Amino acid sequence: QPKSTPTLTVFPPSSEELKENKATLVCLISNFSPSGVTVAWKANGTPITQGVDTSNPTKEGNKFMASSFLHLTSDQWRSHNSFTCQVTHEGDTVEKSLSPAECL
């Protein structure tokens, strides 16, 4: 089975959620094979380990997909310039960043 590097999409928190002082970022990891991935989140380049919830990969056709959630408060979300979802797969690292300023 050919190796396939994951595609990442990062979604910002919803405005409804921010009103409740919560912020959940979602990193969608898709189209990868084989199934082993390691997900790390960073805020302004610094690793975040708390509030991270990553699903087990599920098979979609002959590829896999997974998602990782980063649970923050709205203050944490607003107080950083960038959030990055970093995925390591078969020795390759792919990352996708999201900037709160672009989401206002």
Curated annotation (Swiss-Prot):
One of its GO terms (cellular component) is extracellular region. SUPFAM superfamilies: Immunoglobulin. The keyword DNA repair does not apply. The keyword Ion transport does not apply. It holds the Pfam family C1-set. The gene is Iglc2. Keywords: Disulfide bond, Immunoglobulin domain. It comes from the Eukaryota. InterPro entries: Ig-like_dom (IPR007110), Ig-like_dom_sf (IPR036179), Ig-like_fold (IPR013783), Ig/MHC_CS (IPR003006), Ig_C1-set (IPR003597), MHC/Immunoglobulin (IPR050160). This is Ig lambda-2 chain C region. Residues 6-99 form the Ig-like domain. Transmembrane segments: none annotated.
